[in-house]
Amino acid sequence: MQYKKTLVASALAATTLAAYAPSEPWSTLTPTATYSGGVTDYASTFGIAVQPISTTSSASSAATTASSKAKRAASQIGDGQVQAATTTASVSTKSSAAAVSQIGDGQIQATTKTTAAAVSRDGQIQATTKTTSAKTTAAAVSQIGDGQIQATTTTLAPKSTAAAVSQMGDGQIQATTKTTAAAVSQIGDGQVQATTKTTAAAVSQIGDGQVQATTKTTAAAVSQITDGQVQATTKTTQAASQVSDGQVQATSATSASAAATSTDPVDAVSCKTSGTLEMNLKGGILTDGKGRIGSIVANRQFQFDGPPPQAGAIYAAGWSITPDGNLAIGDNDVFYQCLSGTFYNLYDEHIGSQCTPVHLEAIDLIDC
């Protein structure tokens, strides 16, 4: 009798485990179509920034000029979800971008505010003489622990700098509520959320994987000359130096990972901070800094889980970076930020009246 009970218990356990196992290898959960010219392998770690799309333009062609659109970095909560903040402030077209933070659950959120570049004594601000390789400044996305990704809820005058996305510990991704390039953070669950303002706030990451963006974002460091003029370096990787006469100059050297090349689709950079949502793309598979799989789950939300990805996931592969520098799944580079309280969750489809189309701009992450 005891032996029979043991067999029954074992059978039930096996059935339970089978219920959580993917019906097929998760790496095959990919769209049938691919993005023309998309890059499925990217050599360096990168983040994402939320860039609103004009509703009057077509979804596939809307996008791009950094100077004409506001960008907000997505944040990620620990559960892997990705969220954008609810507000967006105007951002500038400078070469540095606020980094995205990640919360423990994997969610991604963007910060709520972004700081402007420092001004010199006489108040003048000047850019360096090199502009060909400079990348646009984008706010980094933070990740919360759950892996979710969310975008912020409000948008101000758009500019080329994007708010960073944060990630929570669960993998969710969230963006901030303002478009002034608020950084995205990630919470521990992998969710990605953006802060309430997109003013390029830096993104942090909570233990659950969610990504959240900090409430403020710093702009590229500016150098100052003795006469009070302030000059911005062409890249944010190098610290500004000071000459004996009091002038402050930025070094000409830049890190190899941040330097733009003719074949590099990513033209924006952001400062990386603790908790910043960091992603890697290899063979069409997107992973966050904790090795969780970027996927479109059953409710069409973009978040990080596993591996393996969440049961019922629709797509877990087929990611790429488009020639315009946007993240794409299959042949689609248009995502939707849908209002959820003070944050936007990110989806690959329009799921309700509170949703607006966005691009998820890839941004190189640098140490500042």
From Swiss-Prot:
Proregion residues excised on maturation: 19-72
GO biological process, one term: fungal-type cell wall organization
Domain of life (superkingdom): Eukaryota
Pfam families: PIR, PIR1-like_C
Site, Cleavage: residue positions: 72-73
Residues annotated as signal peptide: 1-18
Compartments where found: Secreted, Cell wall
Keywords from the named record: Cell wall, Cell wall biogenesis/degradation, Cleavage on pair of basic residues, Glycoprotein, Repeat, Secreted, Signal, Stress response
Keyword Repeat: yes
Post-translational modification: Covalently linked to beta-1,3-glucan of the inner cell wall layer via an alkali-sensitive ester linkage between the gamma-carboxyl group of glutamic acids, arising from specific glutamines within the PIR1/2/3 repeats, and hydroxyl groups of glucoses of beta-1,3-glucan chains. The propeptide is cleaved off in the late Golgi. While both peptides are secreted, only a fraction of the mature glycoprotein is incorporated into the cell wall.
Per-repeat ranges for PIR1/2/3: 71-89, 97-113, 114-132, 138-156, 162-180, 181-199, 200-218, 219-236, 237-255
Cited InterPro entries: PIR1-like_C, Yeast_CWMannoprotein_PIR, Yeast_PIR_rpt
One term under GO cellular component: extracellular region
Entry keyword Signal: yes
GO function term, MF aspect, one: structural constituent of cell wall
Record-marked site positions (Covalent attachment to cell wall glycan): 81, 107, 124, 148, 172, 191, 210, 229, 247
Note on domains (UniProt): The PIR1/2/3 repeats are required for the covalent linkage to the cell wall. Their number varies among different strains of S.cerevisiae.
Protein family membership: Belongs to the PIR protein family.
Function: Component of the outer cell wall layer. Required for stability of the cell wall and for optimal growth. Required for resistance against several antifungal and cell wall-perturbing agents and for tolerance to heat shock.
This protein's name: Cell wall mannoprotein HSP150
Organism: Saccharomyces cerevisiae (strain RM11-1a)
Lineage: Eukaryota, Fungi, Dikarya, Ascomycota, Saccharomycotina
